[in-house]
Amino acid sequence: MKHALDEIEVATQRITTNAGNDVVTISVAPNFLTRWLMPRMSRFQDKYPDVELQISASTGLIDFNKSATDMAVYFGHGDWHDIEVHFLRNVFQVPVCSPGLMSGSRPLIQPADLRRHTLIHVSKRLYEWPEWLQLAGVEYTGFSRGLQLSSSQLATAAAQEGLGIALADSTLTSREIEQGKLVVPFDLMMDTHKSFYLVYQKNRLLTYGMQAFKDWVIEEMLDSSVIKETSELGVNKHG
């Protein structure tokens, strides 16, 4: 958990590429920043060495008419008004937990086995686990064990520490899954019906740096694998 808090602290600091004349200020959610953007920053630096990015971590909406922020990545339905909105990708969730939890004394063979484990909830999205369980054909009854945390970032970190099972964005956790830090006990993916979007001030003429970041993040999103084949990840098939 301390590692996750350290990551958030780092994420709130300014991140810059090589100094250049074109500066772009960007606001993104901490989870998106630490799990998706930061691991890919070197590719942006290599492709656009003359663009400087100043990135801050925030989940709030930006008033681009008053803020110095040039661009932001929002998570939602894409129905914000008076800003330019560009779709990046849909968000799907899968259950994730630590490898140790999978090999413990309470095996996870089928979704109903989750009743014997702690479910980790994001406090503002308590509906997610009941919806996933309904999709899996399991009634949300008998789940007395639970842990509520304030963000997806902390929920995923808690799962990695073996504190329970969390629902996580399948793309944002792909590195931890590939590295064996997290495992997917069941391969049932739930469509959140929400997406990531790149947004900025309406009718704004993009600078070279803003256009560069826009082109790059859209390309990277297209190249991002949602999740590896379940056989490679060693997950249980949902049945």
Segments and roles (model prediction):
Residues 1-17:
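Alpha-helical "hinge/linker" immediately C-terminal to small N-terminal DNA-binding modules
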Residues 17-24, 113-116:
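Immediate post-signal peptide segment of exported/extracytoplasmic ligand-binding proteins
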Residues 25-27, 72, 120, 166, ...:
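Short, well-ordered beta-strand segments
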Residues 50, 170-179, 189-239:
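C-terminal effector-binding regulatory domain of bacterial HTH transcription factors
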